[in-house]
C-alpha cells in the first residue's frame, strides 16, 4: 500500500498514513512516501499504528482514534516530549507507547505517561513490557 491508499477486507478497513522523519539529521532514516503508518477500523473502533515516524502533521490531523500505538526512540522516531505533544493534539482514548528501547533517557515511558496524563484526563496511557529482560 502507498500513503493514502485504503482497502477493506472481511469488514476491516485499512488506511495507509504517511510516516517519516522531520529532523534534518534523521530525514534519510524514513523518507516521506517510503513507509506507512496505518488506521485500522472495524465495527466503529479505530486503531492507529504510527510506524517509525515523528510528530508529523498527518498524525496531528487524526480524529476519532480509539487506540494509538506511538513510537519514541531517537534517532529513529521522536523524543518523548514530541510523542506526548502529538498524542495531546489528536487525543486518542488510549495510547500504547512502543519502540522505546533506546538510549538512556531518550525513551522514558514514565515521563511520556506523566506528560500525557498531567495534560489530559481523557487519554489513558497503557504501558506494556514490550522488552522484558
Predicted regions and their residues:
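Metallo-beta-lactamase
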Residues: 39-90, 98-107
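Short, low-complexity, polar/charged sequence segments that are solvent-exposed and flexible
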Residues: 17-19, 33-37, 67-70, 87-91, ...
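Core dinuclear metal-dependent hydrolase active-site scaffold
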Residues: 1-63, 129-133
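Binuclear metal-ion centers of metallo-dependent hydrolases, dominated by the metallo-beta-lactamase
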Residues: 1-5, 84, 88, 93-133
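Hydrophobic/aromatic beta-strand patches that form the interior of the parallel beta-sheet core
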Residues: 15, 67-69, 96, 126
